[in-house]
Amino acid sequence: MSRVAKNPVTVPAGVEVKFGTEALVIKGKNGELSFPLHSDVAIEFNDGKLTFVANNSSKQANAMSGTARALVSNMVKGVSEGFEKKLQLMGVGYRAQAQGKILNLSLGFSHPIVYEMPEGVSVQTPSQTEIVLTGSDKQVVGQVASEIRAFRAPEPYKGKGVRYVGEVVVMKEAKKK
């Protein structure tokens, strides 16, 4: 049995778990997420706890039970608390502005970048150099943050670009004459 799958997932109050024929549906105050059921993993719901057991003793079944537990745990946290990623713009003239589901970025190009948020992700800009992404699906929030960062990744000489808050950019030394 997977070491990750040994720990049950505690379902907090206000989160509803439903078993469908092909998917596990988790509903909470931040929305609804579904997880497709895998044939190698059995999921049981008792006393507010989800337990994951491999159906057979194969390596793949053990691995899938741990993977399923981790993904469902993230979904439970997402629909109850939500996930947040913060980005920071470093550089002269680099600005961000949120207008509903659209993020306008000025990153030193000859044109502004207009990024439309996917379903389930909201964006706020507390200041012109800060971006805060929130949503219930951890994977989608991380993917959006990664795509925004990829527009202008931090460069190693001056550190200009879009970075995660708390990210350490390793700086290089300039060429000496």
Curated annotation (Swiss-Prot):
Which InterPro entries does this UniProt record tie to the protein? Answer: Ribosomal_uL6-like (IPR000702), Ribosomal_uL6-like_a/b-dom_sf (IPR036789), Ribosomal_uL6_a/b-dom (IPR020040), Ribosomal_uL6_bac-type (IPR019906), Ribosomal_uL6_CS (IPR002358)
Q: Which GO terms describe its biological process?
A: cytoplasmic translation
Q: Mind naming one GO cellular-component term on file for this protein?
A: cytosolic large ribosomal subunit
Check the record and name the PROSITE patterns matching this protein: RIBOSOMAL_L6_1
User: What is a GO molecular function of this protein?
Assistant: structural constituent of ribosome
Keywords of this entry: Ribonucleoprotein, Ribosomal protein, RNA-binding, rRNA-binding
Family in the record: Belongs to the universal ribosomal protein uL6 family.
Known function: This protein binds to the 23S rRNA, and is important in its secondary structure. It is located near the subunit interface in the base of the L7/L12 stalk, and near the tRNA binding site of the peptidyltransferase center.
Q: How does it assemble?
A: Part of the 50S ribosomal subunit.
This one is known as: Large ribosomal subunit protein uL6
| Gene name of the encoded protein | rplF
